[in-house]
Amino acid sequence: MNLFSMPLGQMLALSEGEGGLFDFNATLPLMALQFILLTVILTFVFYKPIGNLLEEREAYINGNLSDASAKLLQADELCKQYEEQLKDAKADAQSCIADAETEAKQVVALELAQARKDAASLVEQVNKELEAQKELALKQLEAQIDELSQLIKEKLLGKQAIL
C-alpha cells in the first residue's frame, strides 16, 4: 500500500504505534548530527573549493575584461591616430596634385608662348622671304618690261621709219 493513497485516519493510526511515521527516539538527534556533520564535510570538501574556483574564475574574467577594455581603448586611440595620419596624407596628396597641376599649366603656358613666338618668327621670316621674292620678281618684271617696251618702241618706230 502506498503512503500517499492512504486516508489520513490510517496514517495517524500507523503513527501512534511503534514504527510509525514519526518516532521520537535517539534516531532523530543522530540524524540531525549526521546532517550537520555532512554539511560541515561538504563545506570543506566541496563548497569551499568550488567557491575558491569560482572566485579565481571571476578574478580571471575581470582581469581579462580589464585587459580587453585597455586594449580596446588603445585600439581606438591608434585608430584615431591612423585616421589623422590618413587625413594628413590625403591633404598632402591634394596639395601635391594641385602643385603638379599648377606646374603643368605653367609648363604648358611657357611652351605655348614659345610656340607662338616661334610661329610669329616663322611667319615674319616667311613674310620677309616673300617680300624679297616679290621685290626680285618685280625687278625682273621691270627689266622685262623695259626690254619689252624697248622692243615695242623699236617695232613701232621701226615701222614708222619704213613708212
Swiss-Prot record:
Record-level GO cellular component terms: chloroplast thylakoid membrane; proton-transporting ATP synthase complex
Oligomer and partners: F-type ATPases have 2 components, F(1) - the catalytic core - and F(0) - the membrane proton channel. F(1) has five subunits: alpha(3), beta(3), gamma(1), delta(1), epsilon(1). F(0) has four main subunits: a(1), b(1), b'(1) and c(10-14). The alpha and beta chains form an alternating ring which encloses part of the gamma chain. F(1) is attached to F(0) by a central stalk formed by the gamma and epsilon chains, while a peripheral stalk is formed by the delta, b and b' chains.
Record carries keyword rRNA-binding: no
Main location: plastid
InterPro entries: ATP_synth_b, ATP_synth_b/b'su_bac/chlpt, ATP_synthase_B_chain
A Pfam family recorded for this sequence: ATP-synt_B
Bilayer topology annotation: Single-pass membrane protein
Role noted for this protein: F(1)F(0) ATP synthase produces ATP from ADP in the presence of a proton or sodium gradient. F-type ATPases consist of two structural domains, F(1) containing the extramembraneous catalytic core and F(0) containing the membrane proton channel, linked together by a central stalk and a peripheral stalk. During catalysis, ATP synthesis in the catalytic domain of F(1) is coupled via a rotary mechanism of the central stalk subunits to proton translocation.
Transmembrane spans: 26-46
Single GO term (MF): proton-transporting ATP synthase activity, rotational mechanism
UniProt-recorded name of the protein: ATP synthase subunit b', chloroplastic
Further facts: In plastids the F-type ATPase is also known as CF(1)CF(0).
Location in the cell: Plastid, Chloroplast thylakoid membrane
Family: Belongs to the ATPase B chain family.
Lineage: Eukaryota, Haptista, Haptophyta, Prymnesiophyceae, Coccolithales
Organism: Ochrosphaera neapolitana
Keywords: ATP synthesis, ATP-binding, CF(0), Chloroplast, Hydrogen ion transport, Ion transport, Membrane, Nucleotide-binding, Plastid, Thylakoid, Transmembrane, Transmembrane helix, Transport
Superkingdom field: Eukaryota
